[in-house]
Amino acid sequence: MVRVSLWLSVTAVAVLFGWGSWQRRWIADDGLIVLRTVRNLLAGNGPVFNQGERVEANTSTAWTYLLYVGGWVGGPMRLEYVALALAMVLSLLGMVLLMLGTGRLYAPSLRGRRAIMLPAGALVYIAVPPARDFATSGLESGLVLAYLGLLWWMMVCWSQPLRARPDSQMFLGALAFVAGCSVLVRPEFALIGGLALIMMLIAARTWRRRVLIVLAGGFLPVAYQIFRMGYYGLLVPSTALAKDAAGDKWSQGMIYVSNFNRPYALWVPLVLSVPLGLLLMTARRRPSFLRPVLAPDYGRVARAVQSPPAVVAFIVGSGVLQALYWIRQGGDFMHGRVLLAPLFCLLAPVGVIPILLPDGKDFSRETGRWLVGALSGLWLGIAGWSLWAANSPGMGDDATRVTYSGIVDERRFYAQATGHAHPLTAADYLDYPRMAAVLTALNNTPEGALLLPSGNYNQWDLVPMIRPSSGTAPGGKPAPKPQHAVFFTNMGMLGMNVGLDVRVIDQIGLVNPLAAHTERLKHARIGHDKNLFPDWVIADGPWVKWYPGIPGYIDQQWVTQAEAALQCPATRAVLNSVRAPITLHRFLSNVLHSYEFTRYRIDRVPRYELVRCGLDVPDGPGPPPRE
């Protein structure tokens, strides 16, 4: 009965989650950013966003390379569909593993007892609309669920060592490997994977096993970190640098929590889960076939760490730590997204719950009936809340408006802005303001140009490329090929709709190394905390830098000053670390200077940057005459 009811619950939740996620299928602009990198990988340009500039534009390393493999296997299939399929499958797999892990947690105490397994925490998670939104989206959210579900299931198995069978070194190595990969799934998951590895090291009974844990858990993340430092010249992805993950915005973080909680009253299931968990702990048995006796080199602390209660504390503590991390960061601009993983962790111990049928063995029948009644009542409360929350209007009228909080329902925002209920491909985003016009502008400038967004959604401001009048560059060299660059915030939809030879740059620093090294603005919209002036972009390229070649709202003096500021030796070193050809010498130099490059910041006002760097302020022409 227990096993049948567990699998029925798993199947029911997976079907509901899959159906609900498919009804809200989409690919986010940030998801398209990842696909631009995958396009470059498939084209042989390396893991970059723009050719000739080594920027790690994606937070999840594992998700990037998983999509790369999927795109390679998929061949002619559109990358958007590959991302959609992988995200959906991994989301469902994560939910299945969560429930199987929780079922395994309770299984030993249910041996020989009659019980029905019912979904509880799993229902809560899939009822929250953002959980179904980000089950697709093209972001790493599905991979996050699959990873957390797998780690939870494996940690539960590890916490239940059998007396009749010694621990398998293969399983131990696999668990250490999975825990070590946490930082490749998302950088902040190092808190989760690191804690799991520490628990394993404490419980390990021999030095040989400790060495195995360290090697299996540390080899891949350490190897990739060395690659990141040498190839990108940074300690962290460019996305972390752009959002200054070392900073804190506690007040904005609390606004984000409130924004996530208010539409769904999330406190209700969380409050109900506490007495539910306590009742389940009261009713559980201590089965004799688990290892309860002392063993050589296996002391009290090791036994306490390698136990189901410790693993429950681990997953709940991980959820709390992740939530605190994101609250400190200020949350995100996407409604609910970054709090889904903490919620998933907090609900894991009650993903499914056993309803014990009274048998008079451990409790009197009357006590057993009271216990069943209490558990059933709490479960009905959770199920009722789930039904209500699943049909919640969410953020309501504010879902598609960028209000003072800076938080929007990203799926609804892009559905409204593109006119597509399910924006799935880059072509769907051509109906987003300015997107169709950018293709026209690129086709109309065969000699090369920098495109700046204008106030008119149907046109772009153009800055021509400097071309030698004789057709040859100084010194008799052939003239440079026409180049195009586009300066825009939505670099995902833009990057996927233009060729890989078009440089796509942003002002917030996700794909622009110059913007990434500016200071974080204190009161800016969360996730968009940096804002590089377009004057820098004109100065940092082969573009005309004087009137009338530049738009009237650009200050030519600022362009001149920005061009001079780019000659700052430290700034040139940072830019050369990602733009100079990668050689062994460059790689080793980047490794040695990656800490310095990660900490380096410039002032976004060119004049102030010149003063900071100790350079002379050049004399330049004033603004253009006004008619």
From Swiss-Prot:
GO BP term (any one): cell wall organization
Its membrane topology is listed as:
Multi-pass membrane protein
State what protein this is by name: Terminal beta-(1->2)-arabinofuranosyltransferase
Biological role stated in the UniProt entry: Involved in the biosynthesis of the arabinogalactan (AG) region of the mycolylarabinogalactan-peptidoglycan (mAGP) complex, an essential component of the mycobacterial cell wall. Catalyzes the transfer of arabinofuranosyl (Araf) residues from the sugar donor decaprenyl-phospho-arabinose (DPA) to the arabinan domain to form terminal beta-(1->2)-linked Araf residues, which marks the end point for AG arabinan biosynthesis before decoration with mycolic acids.
Q: Where does this protein reside within or beyond the cell?
A: Membrane
Bilayer-crossing residues are: 81-101, 115-135, 138-158, 183-203, 211-231, 263-283, 307-327, 338-358, 370-390
Tell me its family: Belongs to the AftB family.
Cellular component (GO) terms are: membrane
Task: Return one GO MF term.
Answer: glycosyltransferase activity
Mainly resides where? membrane
State the pathway, as annotated in the record. Cell wall biogenesis; cell wall polysaccharide biosynthesis
InterPro entries assigned to the protein according to its UniProt record, in alphabetical order: AftB-like, AftB-like_mycobacteriaceae
Q: Name the UniProt key words of this record, in alphabetical order.
A: Cell wall biogenesis/degradation, Glycosyltransferase, Membrane, Signal, Transferase, Transmembrane, Transmembrane helix
Q: Which residues form the signal peptide?
A: 1-28
Supply the EC number(s).
Answer: 2.4.2.-
Question: What lineage is on file?
Answer: Bacteria, Bacillati, Actinomycetota, Actinomycetes, Mycobacteriales
Top-level enzyme category: transferase
